[in-house]
Amino acid sequence: MLLCDGLGPEPPRQRHRNRTSAARIRKRPKCCCGDGGSGNQAEQPGGIVSNPISYGQSLTTLARVTAAALTTAAMLHTTNALAATGSSSASNSSTGGIALPLGTATPATHELNATQPFGGSGLNFNESGAGLSDHHHHQQHNPDEDWLDNIVWVFKAFVMLLIIIAAICGNLLVIISVMRVRKLRVITNYFVVSLAMADIMVAIMAMTFNFSVQVTGRWNFSPFLCDLWNSLDVYFSTASILHLCCISVDRYYAIVKPLKYPISMTKRVVGIMLLNTWISPALLSFLPIFIGWYTTPQHQQFVIQNPTQCSFVVNKYYAVISSSISFWIPCTIMIFTYLAIFREANRQEKQLMMRHGNAMLMHRPSMQPSGEALSGSGSSKTLTLHEVEQEHTPTKDKHLIKMKREHKAARTLGIIMGTFILCWLPFFLWYTLSMTCEECQVPDIVVSILFWIGYFNSTLNPLIYAYFNRDFREAFRNTLLCLFCNWWKDRHLPLDIDIRRSSLRYDQRAKSVYSESYLNSTTPSHRRQSQMVDNL
């Protein structure tokens, strides 16, 4: 091979010696037909030129930079292609469907939104798909930022887990208390017990799967469980809302139409209402979801192509029907019924106060002659007036106490309705805006917060009972004390107690365990404890 006209072909031995180990670039003397000063370069022993070595190193560095740039460009091109695919699918879904409010899995809708907790290795795309981070970038992260992200992740997981546990334990306490206390076994509390069961199922079937998605950032189960989760979420959330609507109707008949209440709200009618409350959500959740009536053709194709992702997109017809049955119609009924309840409660309270005032004015003049004639037949007059007062006052007091109890129950249930609206209204407002405004985009973190605010309504109902209702508060206290006493007794005093035995027989058997001073004590605290043990 001729390198130059002035130079002959390079000798083979020199051609092999003049190669660098990095880029394998062949070195040769400068051509004499080039610059005049270039031919004065000094040659070291062995035929190796000193200056071309630095030139080869620069070429090697340039080659490495070029390769890195090409690799980065290829990765960015791949990222843009994925982003274009995600945007096209999002545009198709936005034109043909929207996310279902009560059953969607927004944080795991597509792979670009599946973030990894604690900044794990591997590719991690952001929400828009335009950003790219690899293991080298994770190594350059600030340790303080990683520590803060870990703290936020732990706090989020702790709050969600606390909501789940509180919802399960609180509603379970409601069910046990109503079963134990006879005074709470009224028709209204049938709806309350059924509502507590629905809230427990919301915590178990809906919150747990959402908790898994929020913590891990991806769907960890099969596609069948994805559809099952969405169905259960819609089903139990709708059932909980319909229970609140039935409670408002029951209170409406009890206060606004008290004469028709025993005829209208019989056990048969209550059973039909509860049956309808549990059946109608199934027609809205399981049937359309598993048949495929709820979604669009684009989403069905997406599910086939991505079986490991839990995405849930619905068409507008299903969205309008589901939102109306799940929230807007029950909310409208509850608002009208409770407005009528509060109006009637205020009217009855004014009438009772007026009657009580008139009764006091009528009794005051009749009591003066009895005070003046204390001798002779005066005592008989006083006795007669006392008997008349005793005949009329208990009836009025009983009616007044009953009305106050009804009003207190209505106030408690009104607070429950208010918390229900505050918890679910922001979510359904976002849902309505997503239907009407297709260009409006809400961050995934905001949607997740709206979901858990709605879930939090299932946790608040037992707290409202305990704070605003004295009967429930006492029942909760007695139930917790009973559970604690049973736990303490089984742990420290393992006795085989038959609750069907009489208290006297139980005391005779317990003499060998308890001291005589405890059994024969007359202090009030010990009496209360012994009575509590006898009631077991």
Swiss-Prot record:
Parts of the chain on the Extracellular side: 1-157, 212-233, 292-320, 434-444
Spans annotated as Disordered: 1-26
GO BP term, pick one: adenylate cyclase-activating G protein-coupled receptor signaling pathway
Transmembrane stretches, start-end: 158-178, 191-211, 234-256, 271-291, 321-341, 413-433, 445-465
Tissue-specificity statement: In the adult, expressed in the superior protocerebrum and the optic lobe medulla of the central nervous system, nurse cells of egg chambers in the ovary at oogenic stages 1-10, and spermatogonia and spermatocytes in the testis. Expressed in the oviduct epithelium. Also expressed in the spermatheca. Expressed in embryonic and larval ventral nerve cord and brain lobe, embryonic and larval salivary glands and larval imaginal disk and midgut. Also expressed in larval synaptic boutons.
Subcellular location: Cell membrane
Biased composition (Basic residues): 14-26
Homology family: Belongs to the G-protein coupled receptor 1 family.
Naturally occurring in which organism (per UniProt): Drosophila melanogaster
Main location: membrane
Cytoplasmic side: 179-190, 257-270, 342-412, 466-536
Function: Autoreceptor for octopamine (OA), which is a neurotransmitter, neurohormone, and neuromodulator in invertebrates. Essential for ovulation and fertilization. During ovulation it mediates the OA-induced relaxation of the oviduct visceral muscles, by increasing cAMP levels and activating effectors such as calmodulin-dependent kinase II (CaMKII) and cAMP-dependent protein kinase A (PKA) pathways. Positively regulates synaptic growth; an action that is antagonized by Octbeta1R.
Sites where a glycan is attached: 18, 92, 113, 126
Keyword terms of this UniProt record: Cell membrane, G-protein coupled receptor, Glycoprotein, Membrane, Receptor, Transducer, Transmembrane, Transmembrane helix
Pfam family, one: 7tm_1
InterPro entries cross-referenced by the UniProt entry: bZIP, GPCR_Rhodpsn, GPCR_Rhodpsn_7TM
Cross-referenced PANTHER family: ADRENERGIC RECEPTOR-RELATED G-PROTEIN COUPLED RECEPTOR (PTHR24248), OCTOPAMINE RECEPTOR BETA-2R (PTHR24248:SF187)
Name of the molecule in the record: Octopamine receptor beta-2R
GO molecular function: DNA-binding transcription factor activity; G protein-coupled amine receptor activity; octopamine receptor activity
UniProt feature coiled coil, ranges: none
